[in-house]
Amino acid sequence: MFHPHAGAITVRVGGSELPVFFVPSGLADYSYAISLAQQIRVSCPIHVLPWSAIGDPLPHSIEDMAERMIPLIQAIQPEGPYRIAGYSSGGILAYTIAHALICKEESVEFLGFIDVPAPHDLLYKNKDIKHYFIEHVKAVVSESECHKFDILNKGDELAVLIKKAQKLGGYDLNVDISLETVKWQAIYHFSQIAGAYEPLPLPIKLSYFYAAEREPSHLPQIDMVGGWRELLPDLEICSVSIPGRHVSMMENVSNRKHLAEAFDRALL
């Protein structure tokens, strides 16, 4: 999830088209881009712009984070037009990067969102880190098992919460607790700076790929595309429905194939 080196990660090499740069999700995860790249047919290189290494200073704002990403992009592609995409709340960083490039008089020809909430719609952004962690653990388990995690106590230290979540079967057992604690501090920090971002409309088209199915009833329901239309009514948005929910649109192979085909059409 975090990369110890300064450069972008190459997912796919070669191709006659301009490269596509993906940013990690709001959970610092870029594995989605690796899976999606296998099904995108457009002949283009694909790269990932990782977050900084664990333990590096955290950015003061999402604009600061975007500025750190631009040299990674331009080390591979010195000049535009650029193609940038992001999944989940990571898409907010993609938008910020596009804005920063345009402010530098660079061209952005493709900005792709995959089920990205608007900054004001981010979940749990006004909660503390322990509440944030507990809610994310509950979000990934089934509705029938969600009640088991009610015993997680926000009074515990984060490391203790991770251990308890492991014992309850809601967290990977094969992790280093100290590294996970630092990772969640970075994830939580990203949620705060992303939620504080106040985007301005950009003079480009936003290609928005949204999940067609509603989330389970125990999870908050968010109008993903509607949040951006409300926030930026003058922004040109081309929305495309993709089978599945927020997670299954990417994890289900058939749904991901639909997503890759929609990406192909948008990139051509």
Name what the model sees in each region.
Residues 1-268:
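A hydrolase-biased, glycine/serine/histidine/acidic-enriched motif that marks catalytic-domain neighborhoods
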